[in-house]
Amino acid sequence: MLEATPLTEGWILRHEQGPLAAVVPGCVHTDLLAAGLIPDPFLGRNEAEVAWVGRREWTYEVDLPGVDAADGHDRTDLVFDGLDTAAEIRLDGRLLGSVRNMHRSYRFDITGMSGRLSVRFASAYAEAEAVRERLGDRPNAYPEPFQYIRKMACSFGWDWGPTLVTAGIWRPVRLERWSTARIARVRPLVTVDGTTGHVELLVDVERAAGETGLRLEARVGGVGAVAEVEGTSGVVRLEVPGVELWWPRGYGEQPLYQVELTLHSEGDVLDLWRRRVGFRSVELDRSADEHGTGFTLVVNGERLFARGVNWIPDDVFPSRITPGRYRARLTRAAEAGVDLVRIWGGGIYESEDFYDVCDELGLLVWQDFPFACAAYPEEQPLRGEVEAEARENVVRLMPHPSLVLWNGNNENLWGFRDWGWEERLAGESWGEGYYLGLLPRVVAESDPTRPYTAGSPWSGSWERHPNDPAHGTHHSWDVWNREDYAEYRANVPRFVAEFGWQAPPAYATLRRALPGEVLAPDSPGMLHHQKAEDGNGKLARGLARHFALPEADFDRWHYLTQVNQARAIAAGIEHWRSHWPVCAGTIVWQLNDCWPVTSWAAIDGDGREKPLYHELRRLYADRLLTLQVRDEGLVLAAVNQAGEAWDPAGVRLRRMSVQGVVVAEVTVSVSAAARTVAGVRVPHEVEPVEAKEFLVADGDGLRAVYFPVPDREVPYPQPEFDVEVGPGSVTVSARTLVRDLLLQADRLGTAARADTGLVTLLPGERVTIGVRGWEDVPGVEDVRRALYCVEPAR
């Protein structure tokens, strides 16, 4: 039987100042940080102080005693699941191999060898710049050479991330001892026909020597099957009756079946492969219709409006991301109503831990191939690396039922057409051959049960603009970059794969990241932790359209920018959800951060939720009431993504003044069948017509609020409310209109979390906000100082 021994102990890292203890899996930066040799690059402006690390060579070493004994096995292999990135591997001075791809695993036969194992990493900068020198400079979105090396692109910085180019053994390394043969690769093709599941295991084996007879045995769901190995391959087919379907979150359960495959020779078990699978079908409906070209995910025959978030690496040093951290982040996503996570193409092919959690939670996964915002050369050595990594990772991730879509790249097709690349490239390769040739071929050959799309955004044809909202996927970035979020209403894309609005992280996150700094939007540390081009300018212009800008009041600025972020995303999602099935999904940019930064994230780099996160819980709930401005006037839309019809017992519409007076009131009926949207025209008598008026819609425990003018024009009363504090709660009772009340619980204790975000209270209403994590129950005045709401323009 194959024996695997992890190599986690005894590693040292050699560098200019001598050896130091190393953690494997890990990376250079985290080892230097643990040794006290560099400051924390996440704090202050330390990022610049550690830039030298990416320009150096680094060597990891460990002794491998007794490898030559081999413990009676025919073979001993040294296996690396991930090396970041360009490295030479030597054992006892002998070169085992040279590698240059973070996204691949590597295996070396070291039978009969022992001694000092050395992994010497070249500077990723030096490697990338050498390739650029050889192949020629090509355009990208950031002035770094990230497209010339198969490494996580955002290591080189992004408009939300630091430039921290590291190196290291970033995924597990082990010794594998085996005899006769081992299971080298398994491609599980899992399909379902009614309630009958089909599992086809296409198996490759590696032989140590000879042509010994080999047999494969597989079991799943109480069903077994056997097949002989012919040469170095075999196929095992199983038919499993009465299977339960795996469904996305909110549509059904997520039953998982364990597949166990064993390799036998003359009665001995040589190797074991074990994975969990789920039985479900997935299609991507890209049919043409009167609105353009659709982009609708269909799972088990059910058409979905995808309630999505974009995912970036959760740490700029991915080796630090634990299984528990993956589970915490993804659980928070599921609790916010998310049912689809897009893994963005400037990061990595995500880990088994990530996908296991998605399988269990029913989170659909859209996996980008790692290409983003650049013209990628198709010449060697890069082309061979791209094909090898794609084939390996497609097969690695195939077992996971959560994986429903492969996407060729992020914004590169758009960049070629719109960002001046075509002229600059002048006929040089830029990645089109990957996205329209190599990658779809790899997916078709290896994973034919899943759809592939060439890129995001992509309209499906060069005959149309790549980012045409009427065809395929659309990235909506005119809003934020140039326009107000009210402009989301200008079109109805078929699928919105990116849109977003920035806000700073939680106050406690800022205080940890910028210790001792007098905080201001333009203070040195705040500017350093704002990576977007003209980011603060866009924040200011976005605020000015809606609010009177606070002067020299950082706390108000912090609150209002977070409110504006939540409102912007709400404007988009409510509009687009109300247009289902023409629009079939929204993927918010972005769920998470990789460090403390002002960004588009809903959960900041320290794991604290912004108000946007709590707003997503409302926006992505199965049922949503929304008031929408249409050509014919104001419309009340009932969005019902639940599996049962929704017939609220009358929706109460109140036209109110900001002083709390009900000017007019009616009750309307609206009924939405399962998975549909229904709308009703708001009667004229309850439409607000003055700046001092607004409309409230209440039905079935849900509320929608509509103000006809920006906040800066609304004559709000001075907010008045009473506060009660309990052991784990804060209750606020409104005496006036209180708009967008927010408890910033982290101001009361760095571990404190509130379970509620922005709440609008009418006079006489109250809300109880649950709080966990504070050490001592604070006083009422302390809580008042942590409560914020919209105030009259000053």
Segment roles from a protein language model:
Residues 376-464, 567, 607:
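Active-site neighborhood of glycoside hydrolase catalytic domains
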Residues 15, 168, 406, 441-444, ...:
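Substrate-binding clefts and catalytic carboxylate motifs of secreted carbohydrate-active enzymes
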Residues 56-63, 329, 333-336, 354, ...:
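Alpha-helical packing segments of well-folded alpha/beta enzyme cores
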Residues 1-341, 470, 477, 578-579, ...:
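Secreted/periplasmic carbohydrate-active enzymes, especially glycoside hydrolases
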Residues 286-419:
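Substrate-binding cleft of carbohydrate-active enzyme catalytic domains
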Residues 133-140, 357-364, 378-391, 421-429, ...:
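Aromatic- and acidic-residue-enriched segments that line the glycan-binding/catalytic groove
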Residues 86-87, 126-127, 285, 313-316, ...:
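Flexible loop/turn segments at secondary-structure boundaries
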Residues 81-84, 122, 278-280, 309-312, ...:
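Short, solvent-exposed turn/loop segments enriched in Gly/Ser/Thr/Pro and often Arg
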